[in-house]
Amino acid sequence: MVRILYFRLLFTLPVSTVLCLAVFSPATASPADAPGTHRITITFTSDRQHNGAAVWFDADGRLRTQTDVPLAHQDAQTKLWSASLVYTRRSPSEPLDALFQSTGSLSRCEIWVDSVLVADDTVRGHHPTSTCRPRN
């Protein structure tokens, strides 16, 4: 009886360890981009969390709009709010413009293709609107 319990303990311990490592190992943060695609990141920044409107072109080149835009992340040092749209697309010829209206006094938009900043605009004033259009 003691031998059976000892064997079960010796068997269960390594199996449990392997299963715990498999279950609790970190997952990949994001899947790898498909070959021939570009990762597009559009970032909106404001001094207010809740803002007016945002307009951008999606992965298929369709114009998208959103009103009452909430920004989810606040930078601890600058106290500015920001949010990013991230998608992949194949065609570099699709439009890549963005527009953002703040309810505060600062509006900023940035467009990144892969890791290259292709457009940015910062406007200050009363309910400013920033416009991003890639430089050619």
What is each of the regions a protein language model found here?
Residues 1-6:
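N-terminal secretory signal peptides that target proteins for export/translocation
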Residues 21-36:
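C-terminal region of N-terminal signal peptides and the immediate post-cleavage residues
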Residues 33-35, 130-136:
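Short, charged, intrinsically disordered terminal tails
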Residues 83-133:
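Extracytosolic low-complexity repeat regions of secreted or lipid-anchored proteins
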Residues 32-63:
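Short, surface-exposed binding/anchoring microloops in extracellular/periplasmic proteins
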Residues 11-22:
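Bacterial N-terminal signal peptides
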Residues 51, 56-103:
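Mature extracytoplasmic domains of secretory-pathway proteins
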